[in-house]
């Protein structure tokens, strides 16, 4: 009898873990699809934070292009921040994110808090025509949920 009880508890544990992972994967895909289908983006001067985008060919491996975006200097407190950075280059890998597969973060006004999303594109081709888009979701001091769709301007 103890053996069956042990097996049942083990199965319930496995089902619980896979359900959480499935929910995270579903949320990630929902954010990604929503961002990729977006036609209207927030203007840079309307953002309540600064962004710095960087893209550079990897020094150690010429077939890789490293890219990153830093989100910092918020003008307001930003709680439960979730962010996803995508691009339109063919890619099988997951895009960099925060707050979707891990715990959401907080950016506080007048602090050194920042978010950095890093990714890599495996290519030797020119990357000058790749478009990058950022989705950012957060709650402000009044409890209002904000969603930002931002197209990264390059050059």
Predicted regions and their residues:
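Positively charged n-region of N-terminal signal peptides that target proteins for export
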Residues: 1-4
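Sec-dependent N-terminal signal peptides
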Residues: 6-9
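C-terminal motif of bacterial Sec signal peptides marking the signal peptidase cleavage site
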Residues: 13-16
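N-terminal export/targeting and maturation segments
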Residues: 18-95, 100-101, 111-112
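Hydrophobic residues positioned within well-ordered beta-strands of beta-sheet architectures
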Residues: 51, 65-67, 81, 117, ...
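Short, cysteine-centered beta-strand-loop-beta hairpins and adjacent loop/turn segments enriched
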Residues: 74-77, 140-144
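Short, solvent-exposed, Trp/other aromatic-anchored flexible loops in extracytoplasmic proteins
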Residues: 94-142
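Short beta-strand elements
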Residues: 143-155
């Amino acid at each position: 009898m103890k053996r069956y009880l042990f097996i049942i508890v083990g199965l319930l544990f496995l089902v619980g873990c896979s359900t959480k992972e499935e929910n995270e994967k579903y949320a990630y895909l929902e954010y990604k699809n929503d961002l990729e289908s977006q036609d209207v983006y927030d203007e840079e001067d309307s953002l309540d934070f600064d962004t710095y985008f960087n893209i550079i060919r990897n020094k150690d491996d010429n077939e890789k292009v490293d890219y990153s975006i830093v989100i910092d200097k918020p003008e307001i407190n930003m709680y439960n921040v979730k962010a996803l950075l995508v691009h339109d280059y063919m890619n099988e890998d997951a895009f960099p994110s925060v707050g979707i597969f891990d715990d959401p973060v907080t950016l506080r006004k007048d602090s050194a808090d920042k978010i950095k999303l890093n990714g890599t594109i495996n290519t030797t081709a020119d990357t000058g025509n790749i478009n990058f888009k950022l989705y950012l979701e957060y709650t402000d001091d009044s409890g209002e949920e904000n969603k930002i769709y931002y197209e990264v301007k390059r050059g």
